[in-house]
UniProtKB/Swiss-Prot annotation:
Location(s) in or outside the cell: Membrane
Stated family: Belongs to the RL11 family.
Membrane topology type: Single-pass type I membrane protein
Recorded superkingdom: Viruses
Glycosylation sites: 57, 105, 110
Main location class: membrane
UniProt domain Ig-like V-type: residue ranges: 24-122
Organism annotation: Human cytomegalovirus (strain AD169) (HHV-5)
Stretches that traverse the bilayer: 183-203
The protein's name in its UniProt record: Viral Fc-gamma receptor-like protein IR11
Amino acid sequence: MQTYSTPLTLVIVTSLFLFTTQGSSSNAVEPTKKPLKLANYRATCEDRTRTLVTRLNTSHHSVVWQRYDIYSRYMRRMPPLCIITDAYKETTRQGGAAFACTRQNLTLYNLTVKDTGVYLLQDQYTGDVEAFYLIIHPRSFCRALETRRCFYPGPGRVVVTDSQEADRAIISDLKRQWSGLSLHCAWVSGMMIFVGALVICFLRSQRIGEQDAEHLRTDLDTEPLLLTVDGDLQ
């Protein structure tokens, strides 16, 4: 009897756990969908190639990669970069960077400042959406920044855009980037000034030492000669 007590206890505990889990899951309320956020993707400017990777589960779903221009006063939606379904794959060329797309990522090549914008991936099956800020500076930095309260997966698989919030978020990101760049430039300038001051102090001390040596030689050359009683020079 003692041999079967432990397995029987495990069965009872497991059954109670499953029953409790099912009851709690059936009564759980689906949380309200919040704006999607994405961790920062940092990259350097050397090769001008960026890959935007989605966290959405878009396998075997129809997806659309889209770009929003943020150089104009308001965000302007451009034609879809890439549409992928089970039946076909369609890409467009907008005169910007060359690109390659899949259901999970979008790789952009030979980026320029004109390619700055918001790149958005929408899952046509679930309606989920994920957006990337891609801020490109000619020489200083090239980064894909996290999204703010801009794009929502709305009802009917439609992307809902809060234009005012999006504008504020983009302006905030740009200010943050420029402030970071300004601090970096200020730090570099401060280091250059510090190093320059050290070099000037070193050269000045070296020059003062040379002048002291020259004065000493001059004093020795101009010191008067004295005759002793024996006729020796002093």
